[in-house]
Design a protein with these regions (language model features):
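C-terminal charged capping/lid subdomain of soluble metabolic enzymes
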Residues: 118-171
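Conserved anion/nucleotide-ligand pocket segment
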Residues: 1-13
Length: 171
């Protein structure tokens, strides 16, 4: 799903080249099938059933994201959701609790949509995440604002002139 949201946000206000525009248009196929069939596909997968819904999800994850990655410039497919994942890899809890890339990125998408003030879309994804057990809070990925790496980064952000230290209660 991140390919769609990162791609559309990162390319906003640009006049994309033809290849980029194709990838941006195709990026909806990285999110729409997951939101439409994801819950059923998870149940089917857990029951070891190959169904059209599960096939749609597999194709969205493997084929659609592959096409988008190949069509658009790298700056369009790297954004806040993946930056958050990269940052969380330094937390011992990420490895200790075996949090998967997609779990952490799904939380990052929520944060990214909030930062972009896309509240209605964020709320739609929030409901989806809850429906299939994906993270919706820092605690769901066993991260705490007071964890030393997060505390250090909050301090750096607050001293860089970029604004006040984020409140832990807002995370």
């Amino acid at each position: 799903m991140a390919k769609h949201y990162e791609c559309t946000i990162s390319s906003r206000n640009d006049v994309p080249a033809h290849s980029d525009a194709m990838g941006i248009a195709l990026s909806s196929m990285c999110a729409a099938p997951i939101l439409r069939w994801g819950k059923q596909a998870m149940a089917d997968c857990e029951a070891h059933r190959v169904t059209p819904e599960l096939t749609e999800i597999i194709e969205a994850i493997i084929i659609s994201t592959g096409y988008v990655s190949n069509f658009v410039q790298v700056d369009y497919t790297t954004g806040m959701a993946h930056a958050m994942y990269n940052g969380f890899t330094i937390l011992p809890s990420t490895e200790e609790y075996h949090h998967l890339h997609g779990e952490v990125v799904s939380y990052g998408i929520l944060v990214m949509l909030t930062a972009d003030k896309q509240y209605a879309e964020r709320d739609r994804l929030l409901a989806f995440n809850r429906s299939i057990g994906l993270p919706t809070h820092l605690a769901d990925i066993h991260a705490r604002p007071e964890d030393p790496p997060l505390r250090k980064r909050r301090w750096r952000a607050s001293t860089s002139g970029s604004g006040p230290t984020p409140s832990p209660s807002k995370c």
